[in-house]
Amino acid sequence: MVGREKELSIHFVPGDCRLVEEEVNIPNRRVLITGATGLLGRAVYKEFQQNNWHAVGCGFRRARPKFEQVNLLDSNAVHHIIYDFQPHVIVHCAAERRPDVVENHPDAASQLNVDASGNLAKEAAAIGAFLIYISSDYVFDGTNPPYREEDIPNPLNLYGKTKLEGEKAVLENNLGAAVLRIPVLYGEVERLEESAVTIMFDKVQFSNKSANMDHWQQRFPTHVKDVATVCRQLAEKRMLDPSIKGTFHWSGNEQMTKYEMACAIADAFNLPSSHLRPITDSPVVGAQRPRNAQLDCSRLETLGIGQRTPFRIGIKESLWPFLIDKRWRQTVFH
């Protein structure tokens, strides 16, 4: 069953152009996505919208005109959008996700990653909405992988600590919420700097200059569209089964260091990789990282939830507009 509302569209006919008011179908399943302007949020919004959900996204600095502008630190603004829209599901993607930024701005990061998350969980519980809180593999110390949902977290850096505190705030304020821990993400970026994976592309392309690449930390690069699919499938199963709640893990299954990712990127585009230099020492600059925080995803797999895009395919789809001789296409496709 769907609702209906009016929408204006432009109709072109030979010799004429007119503005026409038409009725459009509005799906009755409603989802609110925070951080909808970000890499993951955009994918989550698109996934729900394309699968018969009425999706509303909210952001802050980059919100207009596509999304609602909401300051998640403003409890009144959060209350109003949730009560006005009455979502069945809320996917909370908004976060400060850069470990080094969190170390340098701990109070601001804690407000967004912890305080805002707890308040959102409280508001979701008040209207009976299912909240999916996006967390991180960085809640683990990386010494004993793979990690199951019930394993005891031990974050090494402040980012991981704020995400863990955010998990606690969510589950304390909303017993029916879900926590979804995920690893490093990539996908259709607007800028290469939007992902720790895609940011390597310039170093790969500029083969006339050697580049040091980390070959110590083991990562599991995961496409945002796969995480978005997991969020939708989890939401749809929850609408049929209220026992679906608690903590879940999702991750790609290809283990790679940044050096190995860079070499795979070079291979995908038939570019040289001899200028890339593997560095096997533990990084000494920036926030401490877990060496291998591999996530065990069997709980979601048992529910029949999940999909995985092979890295070579996903990274080629994501990066081809950023080839040096194709960057003009960004104005068209991004």
Curated annotation (Swiss-Prot):
GO biological process, one term: one-carbon metabolic process
Alphabetical keyword list: NADP, One-carbon metabolism, Phosphoprotein
Binding site residues for NADP(+): T37, G38, L39, L40, F60, R61, R62, N71, L72, C93, R97, Y159, L185
Chain segments carrying region Required for interaction with MAT2A: 319-334
Modified residues (Phosphothreonine): T309
CC terms in the record's Gene Ontology section: methionine adenosyltransferase complex
InterPro entries the record matches: dTDP_dehydrorham_reduct (IPR005913), NAD(P)-bd_dom_sf (IPR036291), RmlD-like-bd (IPR029903)
Protein family per UniProt: Belongs to the dTDP-4-dehydrorhamnose reductase family. MAT2B subfamily.
Function: Regulatory subunit of S-adenosylmethionine synthetase 2, an enzyme that catalyzes the formation of S-adenosylmethionine from methionine and ATP. Regulates MAT2A catalytic activity by changing its kinetic properties, increasing its affinity for L-methionine. Can bind NADP (in vitro).
The protein's name: Methionine adenosyltransferase 2 subunit beta
Native organism taxonomy: Eukaryota, Metazoa, Chordata, Craniata, Vertebrata
Gene name tied to this protein: MAT2B
